[in-house]
Amino acid sequence: MSKEIREMIDKVKSFNQFVNENVSNITYKKSVDEDRTTITAFINNKKVGSLSMGVLFDAYQYEFDDVFDEDTFDEIYPDSEIVKIEHIEVDDNYKNSGIGSELMKRGMELMKKNGYNQFYLNASPMGFKGLGTMDLVEFYKKFGFKELLNQGHNVLMGVVF
């Protein structure tokens, strides 16, 4: 093995160790305003990711009336209150480190503890560098989400616990 290849391998190992050490030292903070809950991940006081969600009290009227008829909507979501996961982001340097999964897990657990068991989101690559719609769909399926409607550029997904 050449010296250059060995040096590259050592650099990759060093970087992986750095990322793993930093990822284990993540601090999560929750903030709540009148209509949105945000969970933010920090490493050494630097924001590395966040998840924003809000409760929709008349979701059919505001989100679904042009997508499903009301009977179909009521079959999918029997209760009127639905948590919409509005936005999730992870710093490019920390993608694939588990931060996004941890944000989803913490956010959903928090909302379930507060009595909400229905969730909805748009799987759309807008703002996700290097990820396609189907990559996001597969990510959200890990949390129980199912495809409700594939619109090509965007997939509506939901889960009821």
Please provide the spans of the model-predicted regions.
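Active-site rim helix/loop that mediates acceptor-substrate recognition in acyltransferases
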Residues: 21-43, 50-52
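Short acidic, low-complexity intrinsically disordered linear motifs used
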Residues: 4-22
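Conserved GNAT acetyl-CoA-binding A-motif
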Residues: 111-131
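Conserved acyl-donor/pantetheine-binding loop and adjacent beta-alpha core of acyl/acetyltransferases
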Residues: 40-87
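Residue-level recognition of the GNAT/N-acetyltransferase active site
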Residues: 86, 91, 124
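Conserved acetyl-CoA-binding loop-helix of GNAT-fold acetyltransferases
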Residues: 90, 96-109
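C-terminal "cap" of GNAT-fold acetyltransferases
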Residues: 124-126, 130-137, 141-161
